[in-house]
Amino acid sequence: MAMQLRLIQLEMYLPYVSSNSELLRALSPLKRYCKEQHNIALTIEDFDATDRGEFSLVVIGNNKRNVEQESEHLLTWIETKITGQTLASNISWL
């Protein structure tokens, strides 16, 4: 059975983020959410610019449609739970 992997790369406007610790604090709800999921991996890029944050997620599963639905759910979750706005995104199958 083939594994399906979907890479989601996001750059977000995150107000009041001006250091690595503030970036981690702004994304802490996402870190907690991903920790509770068995099929999602998260990596946060080091702080680079004021009010900006970049991170990548990998959604893993056996069924391509389920991975796609989980990815869409994850993006909706980020949009509603993280204070900020998506500036750029790149979503691809691995």
Language model regions located:
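C-terminal structural segments of small proteins and small subunits
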Residues: 60-94
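Short beta-strand elements
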Residues: 38-46, 85-92
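Short, charge-patterned binding micro-sites
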Residues: 44-61
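Short, flexible turn/loop "capping" segments at secondary-structure junctions
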Residues: 1-7, 48-52
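A structural signal for short, well-ordered beta-strand segments
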Residues: 8-12, 55-57, 89
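Ordered, soluble secondary-structure elements with a strong preference for glycine-centered loop motifs
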Residues: 17-25, 68-69
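Short glycine-/aliphatic-rich beta-strand segments at the starts of folded cytosolic domains
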Residues: 4-16, 20
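Short amphipathic alpha-helix segments
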Residues: 21-39
